[in-house]
Amino acid sequence: QLEEQTINFAEAMEEGRTSKFAKELRKILNARGLKDTGVIVSNDILSTTVLKEQDGQIAFDPRITRATTEEGAVEGEYDKNTDIIFLSLNAVNPDGNATDAEIQTRLNKILDHEMIHALRAKDLITENEYRYLKNLVKNRRVPQAVDAQAFEQKETFYTRSKRINSGLAKLGASANKVEEIYIEEAIAELFRTREV
């Protein structure tokens, strides 16, 4: 059962592009060479993955990005179909008590993660660089400040990625595709937490 569309999609997209948070993130993308990649900050992820066809109409279905009993809400997503990074305010500030500075810091870290997916999709990471990063995430242990459980279990960024993304195998992708996702997610998390 799809949710009834309760938002004005075009309006939400425009607000997501022009919010004070998005403007700060835009500066980061520009500085990192991703001037053509869009960024939208909204309550929910508004990417093509949450749009479904129902009875010949396009419907908004945020169920796959919202928090469940097993998993937290999706914080961000790079949509390669539209070349836009979508970030969720509901995921970074679920109780509504964070200050603007705290929200911006959280969004910046998520942007760092999602930028890796954009760089990879645009083939802006060379094979040598990717091979280096792949080896790095398979050998670098996760710091305690990033994930206490991963630290206790002496996980690398790669083994942590396999654990926290274990549901990927059920989606029907080939073993090679799932492995690539594990590696790319590990690299994205390494970049996100590089200052820890």
For each predicted feature, which ranges?
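Active-site-flanking segments in enzyme catalytic domains
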Residues: Q5-V196
